[in-house]
C-alpha cells in the first residue's frame, strides 16, 4: 500500500516576507491522517486556520494567497511545491505573519526543513487525483492544460523578448515518474525585472526582495553575482510554482500539466474548472501494489 505521509518532528525557521519585508516565524508540524496541508495564523487570537485548497485562494496577484474572512496567507506556492515534491499529505504550517517567508526564492530551503524534520508514513492509503480527460483554460494568449498521463509530468513555456533570455531554453518538460523534484526543480529561484521591482516597491510590494532571494534581471542581463543555478532556471521556477499551485487540489496528481505563459491566476482557474467537472477526474489509491504508483518520491524514513 502506498501510504499517506506527514512529518516526524516539529521544525522551525525564520525568514523574510517577500512583499511585506517583515520577519516571519514559520513552524511545520505533523498532522493526522486526512488532515491535508493546513496553514495557521498563530499571531491572531484566536488563531485562524486555512486549508490549502483551490477554493480558498482569494488573491493571485504575484503569488497564490489563501484568504478566509479577511485573513490572508500569501506566497504559499513554494512551500506547497516542497510538500508536493516530497509527497507530504498532512501537515500544519504555523505563521506569525500574513506571508510565508521567501527564504532563497526557491523551494530548496523548505525541502531541507522537511527532510530535517523527517518524513513518516501513516496507516492510511495515499489518495491521488487521476486526470481522466483533457481540460484547457485560455486567457489573453496564455493557457494552462491538464491531460491524462500515467505519471506526473509538467511542461512550461515562457516567452520573454529580453537579452537575458536570449539563447536560454524558455521551455522545459519534466517527467516525475523518472526524475527527482529535489534535484531537477526545487532549487530554481523566483525571478524579477529591476524595472518592475522599483514599481512594486512604490506600491509597497516586494519590500523583502533582494539578490539573496530572487534572480534579478536588469535591461541586459542577470545581475546576481553567482548567475543561474540551472541554464533554464527561469522556466524551471515556473514549473516549481505550478507544482505548488496544483497541490492546492489537496492530493498528488496523476496526469500531465502544460502551461504557456500561465501564472497563479490561470492555474487556479484551471483547478477550479477541474474540480467542477466530476467527469474529468477521480480519486485513486494503490492499496495492493506499492510499485504501481507512477510517481517517484523520496523514500520516507519509517512508518508512523
Curated annotation (Swiss-Prot):
GO terms for biological process: lipid A biosynthetic process. It comes from the Bacteria. Zn(2+) binds at residues 78, 237, 241. Belongs to the LpxC family. Disulfide bonds: none annotated. GO terms for molecular function: metal ion binding; UDP-3-O-acyl-N-acetylglucosamine deacetylase activity. Its EC number is 3.5.1.108. This is UDP-3-O-acyl-N-acetylglucosamine deacetylase. It catalyses: a UDP-3-O-[(3R)-3-hydroxyacyl]-N-acetyl-alpha-D-glucosamine + H2O = a UDP-3-O-[(3R)-3-hydroxyacyl]-alpha-D-glucosamine + acetate. Keywords: Hydrolase, Lipid A biosynthesis, Lipid biosynthesis, Lipid metabolism, Metal-binding, Zinc. Pfam families: LpxC. InterPro entries: Ribosomal_Su5_D2-typ_SF, UDP-acyl_GlcNac_deAcase, UDP-acyl_GlcNac_deAcase_C, UDP-acyl_N-AcGlcN_deAcase_N. One of its GO terms (cellular component) is membrane. It comes from Nitrosococcus oceani (strain ATCC 19707 / BCRC 17464 / JCM 30415 / NCIMB 11848 / C-107). Pathway: Glycolipid biosynthesis; lipid IV(A) biosynthesis; lipid IV(A) from (3R)-3-hydroxytetradecanoyl-[acyl-carrier-protein] and UDP-N-acetyl-alpha-D-glucosamine: step 2/6. Catalyzes the hydrolysis of UDP-3-O-myristoyl-N-acetylglucosamine to form UDP-3-O-myristoylglucosamine and acetate, the committed step in lipid A biosynthesis. The active site is at 264 (proton donor). Its cofactor is Zn(2+).
